[in-house]
From Swiss-Prot:
GO biological process, one term: hydrogen peroxide catabolic process
Organism, as annotated: Ceratotherium simum (White rhinoceros)
Residues with N-acetylvaline modification: 1
Name of the molecule in the record: Hemoglobin subunit beta
UniProt xrefs under Pfam families: Globin
Domain Globin: 2-146
Gene name linked to the record: HBB
Residues engaged in binding heme b: 63, 92
Function per UniProt: Involved in oxygen transport from the lung to the various peripheral tissues.
Residues with PTM N6-acetyllysine: 59, 82, 144
The keyword Heme belongs to this UniProt entry's keyword annotation: yes
Length: 146
């Protein structure tokens, strides 16, 4: 990911304030509500029949936290995203057969959730930096598909 030193510092500073459980659950939940076809990868999660059911689902929240923890690993290894996400890329490609477009969608949803949680702190400049990061993570996760 091509970030300036200032962008990297800003991304890391905000990430240190992110509550992975809250933001992760909300981001994954929103992905499943806004893009309902993504629910097919989560058959074992129980009731996903309504937006309220999705957003209140304990398995969605738990997996969202796990996803965000992995994303945080990427934030702390911006110079080696492909290496950081190699195993997850292989898992999602070979075993789970997840459409790599879903990584881009989740990244964009994550930016929305960060904006919601951080309000004015999430400046347009910070959003631009995070868009670069989520694009880089999505690309790294899609790496094994190429």
């Amino acid at each position: 990911v091509e970030l300036t030193a200032e962008e990297k510092a800003a991304v890391l500073a905000l990430w240190d304030k992110v509550k992975e459980d809250e933001v992760g659950g909300e981001a994954l939940g929103r992905l499943l509500v806004v893009y309902p076809w993504t629910q097919r990868f989560f058959d074992s999660f129980g009731d996903l029949s309504t937006p309220a059911a999705v957003m209140g689902n304990a398995k969605v929240k738990a997996h969202g936290k796990k996803v965000l923890h992995s994303f945080g690993d990427g934030v702390h290894h911006l110079d080696n995203l492909k290496g950081t996400f190699a195993a997850l890329s292989e898992l999602h490609c070979d075993k789970l057969h997840v459409d790599p477009e879903n990584f881009r969608l989740l990244g964009n949803v994550l930016v929305v959730v960060l904006a919601k949680h951080f309000g004015k702190q999430f400046t347009p400049e910070l959003q631009a930096a995070y868009q670069k990061v989520v694009a880089g993570v999505a690309n790294a996760l899609a790496h094994k598909y190429h």
